[in-house]
Design a protein with these regions (language model features):
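AAA+ P-loop NTPase catalytic core and its hallmark functional loops
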Residues: 1-189
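AAA+ P-loop NTPase catalytic core
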Residues: 1-65, 250-344
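A residue-identity detector for tryptophan
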Residues: 132, 169-172, 210, 279, ...
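Intrinsically disordered regions, especially transient/low-confidence alpha-helical propensity segments
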Residues: 166-169, 207, 276, 322
Length: 344
């Protein structure tokens, strides 16, 4: 059973999740799960805006059970629970109720959400027809503040596991004004968009981190503060160290627009002259070949490109990938030369 499940990828992109929410969140409640910093909250707000719904949010870590069920007041000989205004506004119009960090809620708070998630009710009060109920949170493996969810809660929602899609994010980044150098960097190194959550609580690269870094650069530049030193401080304060060091080195060398990797194959003269920039492009080409994206090149193009490089750079590209380059038609003589260089 586990092997069968492993053959399928149940995770979907933010764009796919948004369409599902807009399609059926008025009847079925959703729980969005992913690593921190993917942009779940922004996606929910965007989905609600597009549907013309106001979005009201509750942060799971900052509420108590009575914040959900309401507080009692005496009416005649009976006690009546008064629901909170954020969950049940005076005007009976549909809205988007966003329950952020639901998996981080205390067990009593999770129980208070049962009828809200399944029946769209707060005690004797029903949510306005057409109201969305969407929750979000992190997973146990993300080293975030997460509590075990009860089976009763899980059975009341549709759980959507989310994954990062680089093309999707780049389109969003262009629409929202993310800086060109950040978009170029992520285009060249897609893995830099979302790094694994580190074991220690240190900065790491996520879509949110890149977006906030772009905004920080804009503010620093507007105030005349953006230089090499402040760029490094801001980048290392937001990103994974391996991304921050390469990003800053490229920015300081003013590499300019990064060409499609196919262009460097066909026109090696386009490779940047600066050491950091050249190493960066060659590392991207190495990944390009490893992923099988260079399979369409003719052997003469491959060999012309390799011969244009120094022995050191050739060794960098071919190390541990002799079979890959051999399948592309790289000359045997080049491999012999590299063996001599490596043995020297």
């Amino acid at each position: 059973m586990e092997a069968t499940r492993a053959a399928f990828d149940e995770a979907i992109t933010l764009r796919q999740a948004k369409k599902l929410i807009q399609c059926m969140a008025h009847e079925q409640s959703f729980l969005l799960l992913s690593a921190p910093g993917m942009g779940k909250s922004e996606m929910v707000y965007e989905a609600a805006r597009e549907a013309g719904l106001p979005c009201r949010s509750l942060l799971g870590t900052q509420i108590a059970p009575e914040d959900v069920s309401g507080v009692p007041r005496i009416v005649g000989e009976r006690s009546v629970f008064c629901p909170p205004r954020i969950l049940l506004p005076e005007r009976a119009e549909p809205f988007c109720l966003f329950l952020d960090e639901l998996p981080a809620c205390a067990p009593d708070v999770q129980k208070a959400f049962y009828s809200l998630l399944l029946e769209r009710r707060l005690g004797e009060h029903a949510l306005p027809p057409g109201t969305w109920v969407v929750a979000a949170g992190n997973r146990l493996q993300d080293r975030a503040l997460v509590r075990a969810m009860s089976s009763a809660l899980v059975n009341r929602v549709t759980i959507l596991h989310l994954r990062v899609d680089t093309v999707e994010w780049l389109a969003w980044a262009q629409r929202t004004g993310i800086r060109n150098e950040i978009r170029r960097f992520v285009t060249a190194i897609p893995d830099a968009l979302m790094r694994p959550v580190p074991a220690e609580p240190v900065p790491f690269s996520t879509p949110r981190a890149w977006a906030l870094l772009s905004r920080a650069f804009d503010m620093a530049q507007k105030s005349g503060l953006l230089n090499n030193e402040t760029r490094r401080a801001l980048a290392f304060g937001r990103l994974s160290p391996e991304d921050a060091v390469v990003f800053c080195a490229l920015a300081e060398e003013a590499i300019g627009a990064i060409q499609p990797l196919e262009e460097y194959f066909c026109k090696p003269d386009l490779l940047p002259m600066g050491d950091a920039a050249r190493w960066f492009i060659l590392d991207c080409i190495r990944q390009f070949v490893r992923d099988g994206k260079a399979d369409g090149f003719k052997p003469r193009v491959v060999n012309r490109f390799l011969r244009s490089l120094s022995s050191e750079h050739q060794l960098t590209l071919l190390a541990d990938m002799v079979a890959k380059w051999g399948a592309l038609g790289a000359d045997r003589a080049m491999f012999d030369l590299l063996r001599k260089v490596a043995a020297a």
